[in-house]
Amino acid sequence: MTNIRKTHPLAKIINNSFIDLPAPSNISAWWNFGSLLGICLLLQIATGLFLAMHYTSDTTTAFSSVTHICRDVNYGWIIRYMHANGASMFFICLFLHVGRGLYYGSYTFSETWNVGIVLLFTVMATAFMGYVLPWGQMSFWGATVITNLLSAIPYIGATLVEWIWGGFSVDKATLTRFFAFHFILPFIISALAMIHLLFLHETGSNNPSGMTSESDKIPFHPYYTIKDILGILLLIFILMGLVLFMPDLLGDPDNYTPANPLNTPPHIKPEWYFLFAYAILRSIPNKLGGVLALVLSILILAIIPFLHTSKQRSMTFRPLSQCLFWLLVADLLVLTWIGGQPVEYPFITIGQLASILYFMILLVLMPTTSIIENNLLKW
């Protein structure tokens, strides 16, 4: 009798994806972030569902309903902070996951990579709309500033912005539709994540050496299931440390003030995970140029596979490219810092230089360095 795990139509899919899946024997902890992102998504959907049971998406009661969740609902405070800090953990895992893909050349799996880029955009949109829901000062002004960027689109811009707002400013209609989208998008993300995995399992995982691992595979279970469980425990440990000891560390104090259209906060800034893109947006004096740079700062990932000039897939044996990669990481940290600073000297100049360097590394320096390394191999 054959094992039901291998014959049952549903169990078979799970078996081929998480149990009998042949995996390279040498994948490191950098390959843990896919499963961690899955756990983050499940956690966000679970906590979000319980928050939605008590939240009201009306401008007059939204702020009070969040206060009510924290004060009156049983364990409402922990659900709310797990959801807010869960988003931060989600983005930390996302950035590390994308960074891993860049370092080890995983972008050569073009379908998986492109679905991943769509996932990144969708998660960013979801997080942005979620930030608007508590209807604090930063929620309101963040929504106003970011949606207003669309007015830079020639000819249809102004009409488009008012269509998204559902009126002449960010108001009741905007909040209601943002809540509706924020609720539905995580389920779309789940579907996209399955497509992401489907494409990945067509080719199999990459590995740190960047070479084929067809001759050296091990079953996913128990080897990588136990490794993933360790990663999940660490993730939960860090998340609960944040939630229970410093829940507001990554938030903005301005969001504890109810939204007031008549009073603009001195420094409008998004959540920390958008600051690098926000810094790139602000470093260009032209509105349309800034919006284009903002979109391209993420969309540039789509052309990375076409800029791969190296004879090797991974950066493991390419010290010059490694230096550039870590320079890029440092540059993104500088951009994140600049995004949270006021628009004044010297921050403007630093932001402009960091933005130029960001595009320079990805578009010019990395492909050139790869060619130099190819020639060094001949020596």
Swiss-Prot record:
Subunit structure: The cytochrome bc1 complex contains 11 subunits: 3 respiratory subunits (MT-CYB, CYC1 and UQCRFS1), 2 core proteins (UQCRC1 and UQCRC2) and 6 low-molecular weight proteins (UQCRH/QCR6, UQCRB/QCR7, UQCRQ/QCR8, UQCR10/QCR9, UQCR11/QCR10 and a cleavage product of UQCRFS1). This cytochrome bc1 complex then forms a dimer.
Gene giving rise to this polypeptide: MT-CYB
SUPFAM superfamilies: a domain/subunit of cytochrome bc1 complex (Ubiquinol-cytochrome c reductase), Transmembrane di-heme cytochromes
Name recorded for this polypeptide: Cytochrome b
UniProt cofactor note: Binds 2 heme b groups non-covalently.
TM spans (from-to): 33-53, 77-98, 113-133, 178-198, 226-246, 288-308, 320-340, 347-367
Main location as per UniProt: mitochondrion
Cofactor: heme b
Residues given in the record as a ubiquinone binding sites: 201
GO MF, any single term: metal ion binding
Organism (species): Bassariscus astutus
A single Gene Ontology CC term: respiratory chain complex III
Keyword Membrane: yes
Topology in the lipid bilayer: Multi-pass membrane protein
Keywords carried by this UniProt record: Electron transport, Heme, Iron, Membrane, Metal-binding, Mitochondrion, Mitochondrion inner membrane, Respiratory chain, Transmembrane, Transmembrane helix, Transport, Ubiquinone
Highest taxon listed in the record's lineage: Eukaryota
Record-listed heme b b562 binding positions: 83, 182
Pfam families (alphabetical): Cytochrom_B_C, Cytochrome_B
Function description: Component of the ubiquinol-cytochrome c reductase complex (complex III or cytochrome b-c1 complex) that is part of the mitochondrial respiratory chain. The b-c1 complex mediates electron transfer from ubiquinol to cytochrome c. Contributes to the generation of a proton gradient across the mitochondrial membrane that is then used for ATP synthesis.
